[in-house]
């Protein structure tokens, strides 16, 4: 202030006020230029690497595309794309696998000064940062958008269970991350009764919010107490009547199993529980259910395959192909699942089957390939192409939690979705690290939901006359050929649906797509064809 008054006096004395004002304005303008962010253009977020930051070290910049939170452990890691497990999108050791692996290794940067309690997948629009190095930037400002808790509380994620019409039956499968009632303090799951009550509160709120008619659980305590407790909580919280399938077992330390809880107002079990004890026991079970309103029957198979961790030998050794250890055992479990299905459908006198559970294998790994080649349809890929995930490990998204069905049940599937209340959340919200009593981070895996309309085919566009769908480009605009009467969905590679419409012409143009990579789903004749679009 004294310096300013001194300048004023000097310029007044020499009668040069206009010159003084000009100098002040010039100084202000120069200062504004010095703090303005350089706008950095990212041509293709799918191939962007942190090396592109090197030229901006020491500068303040603003990105012209949104960034995504990819990791929220001990700070934030961000990228202009969601980072996926390579084997969730490509066959192990294939050329595409190696390409994804290479891009993943240099596609993220560390964001300092922005905290850790952000959900994975949150978008940072107009992100302004100070570039510390080509791998680290300091947060200045952004507009946070998308993938919020409020969105999930409104049930927006669950809309996908009705992609092909309104469901009449909702099925949910969830890994409960060691839900224990009797065997507390074993080193797995809750250490004491207080921890159990906190875990129970979070899980019960999640299940009540989902409000399914049929639940399959993995990583739930052996015996009947845990299932009985969940059934009781569901009955209390929903006003409906829930019960469970008693498998006759008893609790044994922290060992877990697969189990079933169902709404007896809507469903009744048919026949006796069938167990498949190939590999890890008590974790692969099938039960048939009849929908009371329609009298329709289907088989529900809940499974938990051998984990990827530990030391293995022979075909169980880690081969460095992204599939981890015990892949051989998981392949054998997948084959046994198919062979048991043959006897199960004879016993239950029905062939419609829905297979769900934590198979500890990503979408393109060998066990899932076995199931697909055995005639099972991957519902994640059928409805969401490459964008689906239910689990995030060290910032890498993918789905270990599967939903598959055979071709006779598929026409009655209205949709499916992984409900992202867990995998995107910070680990600091778990029951043993906080007093958070919300449904968020009730487990480390997302629940997977499947909508059914039994007795009424919901497959759209049965009047499509050919399966020879083609996609071609005319002046950089993609068009679909030979799918008139069908329906298409376009997703960004991060999983966001950006465009969907009926196919009303023989050559349907998909307009309005900017440069980038997209996933295109074309529906018709009870099938879904997926392809990647590279818009130049």
Segments from the language model and where they lie:
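N-terminal, active-site-proximal structural segment of metallo-dependent hydrolase catalytic domains
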Residues: 94-96, 134-237, 241, 246-256, ...
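Sec-dependent N-terminal signal peptides
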Residues: 20-30
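Active-site-proximal beta-strand elements of phosphoester/diester hydrolases
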Residues: 168-184, 271-273, 297-307
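Active-site His/acidic residue clusters
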Residues: 292, 296, 302-327
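Extended non-catalytic accessory segments flanking core domains
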Residues: 36-186, 194-201, 236
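Metal-dependent phosphoester-hydrolase catalytic domains
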Residues: 38-47, 56-58, 63, 113-136, ...
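Structured beta-strand-rich core segments of catalytic domains in phosphoester-bond hydrolases
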Residues: 221, 226-306
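C-terminal outer-membrane/trafficking sorting elements
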Residues: 2, 462-536
């Amino acid at each position: 202030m004294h310096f300013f008054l001194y300048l004023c006096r000097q310029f007044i004395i020499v009668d040069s006020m206009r010159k003084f004002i000009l100098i002040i304005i010039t100084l202000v303008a120069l200062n504004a230029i010095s703090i303005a962010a350089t706008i950095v253009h990212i041509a293709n977020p799918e191939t962007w690497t942190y090396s592109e930051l090197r030229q901006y070290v020491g500068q303040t910049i603003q990105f012209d595309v949104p960034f995504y939170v990819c990791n929220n452990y001990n700070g934030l890691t961000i990228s202009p794309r969601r980072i996926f497990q390579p084997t969730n999108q490509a066959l192990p050791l294939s050329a595409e696998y190696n390409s994804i692996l290479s891009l993943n290794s240099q596609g993220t940067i560390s964001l300092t000064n922005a905290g850790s309690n952000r959900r994975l997948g949150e978008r940072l629009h107009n992100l302004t940062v100070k570039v510390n190095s080509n791998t680290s930037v300091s947060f200045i400002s952004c507009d946070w958008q998308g993938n919020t808790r409020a969105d999930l509380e409104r049930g927006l994620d669950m809309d996908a269970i009705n992609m092909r019409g309104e469901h009449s039956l909702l099925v949910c499968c969830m890994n409960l991350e060691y839900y224990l009632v009797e065997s507390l303090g074993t080193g797995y799951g809750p250490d004491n009764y207080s921890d159990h009550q906190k875990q129970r509160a979070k899980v019960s709120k999640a299940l009540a919010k989902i409000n399914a008619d049929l639940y399959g659980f993995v990583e739930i305590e052996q015996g009947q107490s845990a299932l009985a407790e969940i059934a009781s909580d569901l009955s209390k919280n929903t006003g409906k009547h829930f019960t469970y399938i008693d498998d006759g077992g008893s609790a044994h330390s922290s060992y877990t199993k697969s189990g079933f809880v169902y709404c007896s107002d809507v469903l009744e079990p048919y026949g006796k529980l069938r167990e498949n004890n190939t590999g890890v026991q008590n974790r692969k079970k099938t039960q048939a259910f009849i929908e009371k309103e329609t009298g329709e029957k289907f088989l529900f198979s809940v499974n938990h395959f051998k984990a990827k961790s530990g030391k293995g030998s022979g075909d169980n050794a880690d081969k460095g192909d992204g599939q981890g250890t015990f892949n051989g055992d998981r392949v054998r479990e997948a084959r046994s699942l198919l062979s048991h299905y043959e006897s199960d459908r004879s016993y239950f006198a029905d062939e419609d089957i829905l297979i769900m559970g934590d198979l500890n294998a990503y979408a393109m790994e060998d066990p899932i390939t076995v199931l697909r080649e055995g005639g099972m349809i991957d519902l994640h890929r059928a409805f969401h192409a490459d964008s689906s995930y239910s689990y995030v490990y060290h910032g890498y998204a993918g789905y270990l939690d599967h939903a598959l069905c055979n071709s006779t049940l598929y026409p009655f599937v209205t949709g499916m979705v992984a409900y992202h209340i867990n995998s995107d959340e910070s680990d600091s919200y778990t029951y043993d690290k906080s007093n958070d009593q919300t449904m968020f981070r009730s487990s480390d895996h997302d629940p997977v939901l499947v909508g059914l309309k039994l007795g009424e085919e919901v497959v759209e566009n049965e009047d499509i006359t050919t399966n020879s769908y083609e996609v071609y480009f005319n002046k950089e605009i993609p068009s679909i050929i030979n799918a008139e009467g069908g329906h298409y969905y376009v997703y960004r590679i991060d999983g966001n649906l950006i465009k969907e419409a009926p196919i009303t012409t023989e050559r349907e143009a998909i307009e309005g797509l900017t440069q980038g990579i997209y996933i295109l789903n074309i529906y018709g004749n009870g099938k879904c064809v997926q392809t990647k679009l590279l818009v130049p």
